[in-house]
Amino acid sequence: MPSLKDLKNRISSVKNTRKITKAMQMVAAAKLRRAQEAAEDARPYAERFNAVMAGLAASVGQSDTAPKLLAGTGSDQVQLLVVMTAERGLCGGFNANIAKLARQKVLDLQAAGKTVKILTVGKKGRDVLKREFGDLFVGHVDLTEVKRVGYVDAQGIAKDILARFDAGEFDVATIFYSKFQNVVTQIPTAQQIIPAEFDAEGAEATSGVVDYEPSEEAILADLLPRGVATQIFAGLLENGASEQGARMSAMDNATRNAGEMIDKLTIEYNRSRQAVITNELIEIISGAEAL
């Protein structure tokens, strides 16, 4: 049975932990508001961009002049998985859920006889996947020093991926991230970015004949690389909001659990203290009777 001193030290330790988790919860809540606004503000642009690109892609189809980023290489043998997670932990199952989705994709592709390559963004995903698929890694993007992810960061990642595609290192590229819904719900998502896939239902409807100048192919050749960067940026923003939402929820749970533990330890401390006092009284009474 722990002594009164041990119980007192444990209560003090848990109280200090509760202060830390409460502070982290408040910081995450403040960051969440900014991250959520950024993610939600980017969605209309991404949807509009998809509509324009879907219309252009539909008019070009699979013609011989279609850009390679749209038509693809004609094969899906070599798959590049771009797994985007956080640089930090203490955010519940946020990182683990993305890594789990990517891991399952790797296993499915390998079972189908495909060659898999992995590029990670964020060290938490790298640490998890590298233990099992270290030989599949072709690169890692470190955003530790980036306080607030911007479009320039997405451009850097896109530039690396496009250079690898132009060099013939892979046929299909898919990004993995967590789509933000609310504080308690973040959905691990896989989205193919090369060859480009656009929602045909989102294509802009036109009432007349549209004549593009220059040609649709030339416009697509210019916009498709930007589309890759845009999709990566949108994924990073969704990840940012999801991470803060998951951290806020995790720290809230930790704070409440710490409070419950403090209550239990306090009850145990009071019972032990009462037992000590009772024993001392018994000893005093017994001594008095002996006299």
Curated annotation (Swiss-Prot):
Q: Which family does it belong to?
A: Belongs to the ATPase gamma chain family.
Matching entries from SUPFAM superfamilies are given as: ATP synthase (F1-ATPase), gamma subunit
Q: Which NCBIfam families has this protein been placed in? A: ATPsyn_F1gamma (TIGR01146), PRK05621.1-4 (NF004146)
Under InterPro entries, the record lists: ATP_synth_F1_ATPase_gsu, ATP_synth_F1_gsu, ATP_synth_F1_gsu_CS
Q: Mind listing the UniProt keywords for this protein, alphabetically?
A: ATP synthesis, Cell inner membrane, Cell membrane, CF(1), Hydrogen ion transport, Ion transport, Membrane, Transport
Described purpose of this protein according to its UniProt entry: Produces ATP from ADP in the presence of a proton gradient across the membrane. The gamma chain is believed to be important in regulating ATPase activity and the flow of protons through the CF(0) complex.
Q: How does it assemble?
A: F-type ATPases have 2 components, CF(1) - the catalytic core - and CF(0) - the membrane proton channel. CF(1) has five subunits: alpha(3), beta(3), gamma(1), delta(1), epsilon(1). CF(0) has three main subunits: a, b and c.
- What name has this protein been given in UniProt? ATP synthase gamma chain
Q: Which compartments is it annotated to reside in? A: Cell inner membrane
Keyword Transport assigned to the entry: answer is: yes
Q: Name one GO cellular component term.
A: plasma membrane
Q: Does the keyword Transport apply?
A: yes
